[in-house]
């Protein structure tokens, strides 16, 4: 069981690093090139990103209910597909409305594929024994900015911002999706949802404050 939790932690940690690096940490690098290419102001580019945050907040509770019923694997797998779709749309954007649309799609993926979904997945799998897995996932994904910013910057300077978005989309399909497909299948719905919910809330608070769960 311990080995299974370790494998799950590593797979989710790697998948989370990819998801954060290719979404939350992307505008810091690509906002400038996007604004110059499309004729948008910096503020408008970040306004589009704010739409993603709003959509993500609205999507999160729905994703949580789906994870409660079906387990995290199908939800996280779907998030990789939606991430890839959103990044592809962004790579093809030629006007402001396209950028907003792409980030709205990205918001759907963020709401179903970032920390809250990963935490809910391990709680759904391991119940009160999920705390160490949550800590491990947090430690892995803590490197998302360390990986994402320099990699996005290098790709943008070497190939361009559109190609950078496409490469991140490809990574979701060839790396993130297989990692999530290989996650354990969830068993029957837990009999103590209150305890599970408390564990998720505690984990989220710990991430927000920088403490270990």
Question: What does each model-identified segment do?
Answer:
Residues 17, 86, 97-113, 138:
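Hydrophobic core of transmembrane alpha-helices in multi-pass small-molecule transporters
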Residues 34-35, 66-67, 147-159, 164:
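Interfacial helix-cap and linker-helix signal at transmembrane-aqueous boundaries
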Residues 34, 112-126:
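Intracellular juxtamembrane helix-capping segments at the cytosolic ends
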Residues 58-97:
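Conserved MFS/SLC helix-loop-helix module at the cytosolic interface between two early adjacent transmembrane helices
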Residues 184-212:
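Flexible cytoplasmic inter-helical loops of multi-pass small-molecule transporters
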